[in-house]
Amino acid sequence: MTSDEILMDAEERMDKAVSVLQNNLSGIRTGRANPGLVDSIKVEVYGSLTPLKQLASIGTPEPQQILIRPYDATTIKDIEKAIVAGDLGLNPQNDGRVIRLNVPPLSGEVRKKMVSRIKELAEEAKVSIRNIRRDANKAAETAEKDKEMTEDDRDKTKDQVQELTKKAETNVNESAKAREAEVMED
């Protein structure tokens, strides 16, 4: 592998790790309604598990309410069952056409749990990024042994991989801090 290939692969994988974290963080409840809380809930319908966002439009008509409008009215019971099973602490109100979810404000204890969950997710993302760094460094060493790059190129590649790692970890920290701030605000 060339230096450019190693760097491109590492950057791509690190960006993916950051985007997975951001996706996971969007599913963490804050004090206000957010479609991200429910859009990835899997609903068993038509014999398979389907993400809710493919079965219904999801909106927030009020700051404390999520409104779910199924595209097919026959799926409303399945959607309601999946929300209850999703263990979000939200009680769906089904009027036959739409499902309303009232998002209660978070208590202090729940906020602390959410913040600790955010920190866990951020740490998992950092571990993933460090593993990607290790793989990239190993690829650079292998390329040097196979005479595909010089020792100087290997060292330069390792330095660039470290820069990518710092950038990705900064993105992880910023995403986690922003979500923590959202959880802690009233």
UniProtKB/Swiss-Prot annotation:
One GO term of the cellular component aspect? cytoplasm
Looking at the record, which segments are called Disordered? 134-186
The alphabetized UniProt keywords are: Cytoplasm, Protein biosynthesis
Gene Ontology molecular-function annotations: ribosomal large subunit binding
> What CDD domains does the annotation carry?
RRF
Q: Where is the composition biased (Basic and acidic residues)?
A: 134-169, 176-186
A Pfam family for this UniProt protein?
A: RRF
- Chief place where the protein resides: cytoplasm
Query: InterPro entries, alphabetically?
Result: Ribosome_recyc_fac, Ribosome_recyc_fac_dom, RRF_sf
Give its localization: Cytoplasm
Q: Name one GO biological process term.
A: translation
Function of the molecule: Responsible for the release of ribosomes from messenger RNA at the termination of protein biosynthesis. May increase the efficiency of translation by recycling ribosomes from one round of translation to another.
Q: Which family does it belong to?
A: Belongs to the RRF family.
For this protein, the record's NCBIfam families field holds: frr (TIGR00496)
This protein is called what? Ribosome-recycling factor
Q: What is the lineage of its organism?
A: Bacteria, Pseudomonadati, Planctomycetota, Planctomycetia, Pirellulales
